[in-house]
Curated annotation (Swiss-Prot):
Task performed by this protein: Binds 23S rRNA and is also seen to make contacts with the A and possibly P site tRNAs.
BP term (GO), one: translation
Protein name per UniProt: Large ribosomal subunit protein uL16
Subunit-level organization: Part of the 50S ribosomal subunit.
GO molecular-function terms, A-Z: rRNA binding; structural constituent of ribosome; tRNA binding
Keyword annotations: Ribonucleoprotein, Ribosomal protein, RNA-binding, rRNA-binding, tRNA-binding
InterPro entries listed in its UniProt record: Ribosomal_uL16, Ribosomal_uL16_bact-type, Ribosomal_uL16_CS, Ribosomal_uL16_dom, Ribosomal_uL16_sf
Encoding gene per record: rplP
Pfam families xrefs: Ribosomal_L16
Family affiliation: Belongs to the universal ribosomal protein uL16 family.
Signal peptide residues on this chain, from the entry's feature table: none
PANTHER family: 50S/60S RIBOSOMAL PROTEIN L16, LARGE RIBOSOMAL SUBUNIT PROTEIN UL16M
């Protein structure tokens, strides 16, 4: 699973996910992409589950790029622990997703196969997505 190797700070504040994606909003590596329409957070497990679903569907053909990385630590307190006593331990990592962000890209497969693969991947993700094709001149 994806997670940062080193962090400057082990724990992070929650923050707010606002605005739209100004970076990473175009298909730049492959021919087809899966773009987020809504906002939310993807855990490392969800990113990996969607990748596996796509990889299994396209079999040996094509190439897949993951355009998001879970770099934000999420902490949780153990069960039946009273309030206070400091911030909990880091349990998993998430990637904050803004509308317009390209999550995955694919190349080397027919459009119909790419659509089907992205549909399977989208079913594993908690945010609404859409299929996009690379524009000429990008």
């Amino acid at each position: 699973m994806l997670q940062p190797t080193r962090l400057k700070y082990r724990k992070q504040q929650k923050g707010r996910n606002t605005g739209i994606a100004t970076r990473g909003n175009k298909v730049s590596f492959g021919e087809f992409g899966l773009k987020a329409v809504g906002r939310g957070r993807l855990t490392a497990r969800q990113i990996e589950a969607a990748r596996r679903a796509m990889t299994r569907h396209i079999k040996r053909g094509g190439r897949i790029w993951i355009r998001v990385f879970p770099d934000k630590p999420i902490t949780e307190k153990p069960i039946q622990v009273r309030m206070g006593g400091g911030k909990g331990n880091v349990e998993y990592y998430i990637a904050e997703i803004k509308p317009g962000k390209v999550l995955y890209e694919m190349d080397g497969v027919p459009e119909e196969l790419a659509r089907e693969a992205f549909e399977l991947a989208a079913a594993k993700l908690p945010i609404p997505t859409t299929f996009v094709v690379r524009q000429v001149g990008q």
